[in-house]
Amino acid sequence: MKSFFKPLILKKFLWTLLFVFIYVLGSKLTLPFVDVSSIAKLNGDSVTLNYAAALMGGNLRSMSFFSIGLAPWMSSILIWQMFTVSKRLGLNKLSMESQEKRRMLLTLAIALIQSLGLVLNLPLKTVAGVGQGTIVFLDTLILIAGTYFLIWLTDLNSSMGLGGSIMIVMVSMISYIPQDIWLSIQELKISPLILALIGFFSLCFLYLAVLVERAKYRIPINKINIHNRFKKYSYLDIRVNAAGGLPIMYAMTLVSIPQYFLMLLLFFQPNNRLLKEGILSLAMGGIPWFILYLLTIFILAWAFAFINVNSDQIAERMQRSGEYIENLYPGEATRRYIHKTVGYFAFVGALYLVLVAGLPMLLIFLDIRYMRLGMIPGMFMIFIGMVFSIKDEVDTLTLNDRYHSLF
């Protein structure tokens, strides 16, 4: 806690407060030409999109400038990372400037699909002298501009504040999701006893989630020609859940993209029955959505594990620095061992996330109103990962302050 009151941390925290204020202010500015009183249901199927937007700094409840949030940008980063893992594509050989341009173009494509699909299904007001096409174009442009403004705000927070994009997402989650959970409790008329049990099990799960989040498997590392009493403290750490809670957050967003795309197609073919059924099946509560959601979490958890712990880079770095694992040759043998170990924990972590996010969501098949309560474990996983990420950043920034001068 003392680290928080260091001048550097306080300065960064004040900058973050300013950026959060700008974000909150922008999220209150409603899109022009939109009938706010008629957007509550967003064509009757907004639950999935609402949660996906909230998990990425967006807000579909008030249809503001930041309604789609950082979803296009964060989705493009994920897609790009998954492609750069493969050496065959050679994307990691491109210059940083070229990679950034391609990521931004991918962000633009995703933002265009989401913005256009959203605007075309909004209840728009008719204004004298302004055509429907002009209104759609302007609102789509504003939503895309809002996304790029948030990207810029995130970059500023990364360099001047704390948490980077995490702070925007955390504020979005805190602003809307607890309120939704409380409304569900009131709507379902849950008794105080059941509510107390939910609170107790939530605390137990919170404790378990923190343990899993910080749990690590340590591989002893030796260095050539270095023998000292500190040798036993040299390890390669692999987290048990290397992906953290990110797969749950990204899964909700990626699963919502097909729904945006179908909404876009439905505007041009309003009587297409297949499109309407597709939108309904991809809404929360449907079996296709549930299967796709869990499958996406599993795949992302597996992918994130290999992205976060790249066996090729680790083996190459160890070989250059003269490090080796006991009874293993440096190079290919070391790479295979690390890859196999990461694969094992990737499977364990993916299975853990699927159980944590999937089992509580089975409640929605009893009553869709349980959906918000079923999301609580997943929200805990996401939030815990964000909190520890900020804590690690603060610890890194104050690392030098832990050492004192001898004179």
Curated annotation (Swiss-Prot):
Q: Which residues span the membrane?
A: 13-33, 65-85, 104-124, 133-153, 158-178, 192-212, 248-268, 287-307, 345-365, 370-390
What is the protein's membrane topology class? Multi-pass membrane protein
One GO location term (cellular component): plasma membrane
Predominant location category: membrane
Q: Name one GO biological process term.
A: intracellular protein transmembrane transport
Effect of knocking it out?
Loss of adherence to human platelet cells, loss of export of cell wall protein GspB; GspB accumulates in the cytoplasm.
Subcellular localization? Cell membrane
Family as reported in the entry's similarity comment: Belongs to the SecY/SEC61-alpha family. SecY2 subfamily.
Quaternary assembly: May form heterotrimers with SecE and SecG subunits (Potential). Component of the accessory SecA2/SecY2 protein translocase complex required to export cell wall protein GspB.
What is the role of this chain?
The central subunit of a protein translocation channel (Potential). Part of the accessory SecA2/SecY2 system specifically required to export GspB, a serine-rich repeat cell wall protein encoded upstream in the same operon.
PANTHER family tied to this protein? SECY/SEC61-ALPHA FAMILY MEMBER
Name of this protein: Accessory Sec system protein translocase subunit SecY2
**Species the sequence originates in:** Streptococcus gordonii
Gene name linked to the record: secY2
